[in-house]
Amino acid sequence: MGTPNPADGAAPRRGRASGWARRALAACGLALVLVLAYLFGCEPRYRGTLVVRPPRPLVFAHRGFGDHAPDNSLYAVERALTAGLDGVDVDGQLTRDSELVIFHDLSVDRLTADTGHVRDKTAAQMLALDLGPKYDPRLRGANVHTFEDFVRDVKGRGILMVELKVPGLAASGIERRAVEIIQRYAAHDYVVLSSFNPVVLYRVKRLDPKVRTALIFMDTNWNPELIAEIKPGDVVNLPWPLRQEFIRRAIRKIVRPDLLSINHQVDEAVLDRLIAKGWPVFIWTPDEENALRRALAKRPYGVISDQPIRAQQLRDQ
């Protein structure tokens, strides 16, 4: 009788183990392929339930009617709503003491007599700033206001679309503050929170799925508006991934925004495909006559323009 060899049967066991490992690896690979195919594959039809398509494209004033009154001011919003516009697009930022104020630029230099960044100022300091004199030396009292002031003032007379501006991916509290105010005033029907940052919109939906969100995007890595209006040190390039349509497609599937806000210079084929798939699309800042006509001809959900009165006239022709 021979001495048992410890190696006897080890090779078959190793073979069985390696076979399981190969099958497990293949299954993981297949799962990864399926996930990537879902995320980066064809655009699904829009299935949102919080947005009702209007009978004609909506017309929003960019920067709160900023070409006709002080930028992002309540004074401008009142003028826009009085003119019969469907809504306004404004910008929200957090102050140093975590108040959400409506202000376009990252710094206050261009629009006020003060200097410095919004994030470095308290709410009291921001609300003391007058937007009037830089727009018109004769205009006084068009002060900066909070998001809460805007929500309370609009009261459903139009739609208030607020771009939440954040410095990065880290949680800043801006989403929670915005959602708290929407809930306090039961403003779900007339407030939309928008952002270039999909993480911001994801957080908003985690806080309250009934708050309507809009994902903003463009194809270029620079914003002509920012270049023209804001100090060069404030201009932040749009990250490469957010300029790639295959990545944006995956973002739309994960974040599930209720609307899209698309720059009018985005690849026309992308814009046409999204509209054909049923996405409620805002086209932002077509300002020249021809650009407005092209945008409205696509029958989008709406346009956001610095020339909203002309856009309104063209739409109603």
Predicted regions and their residues:
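Phosphate-group recognition and catalysis centered on beta-loop-alpha active-site segments
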Residues: 2-317
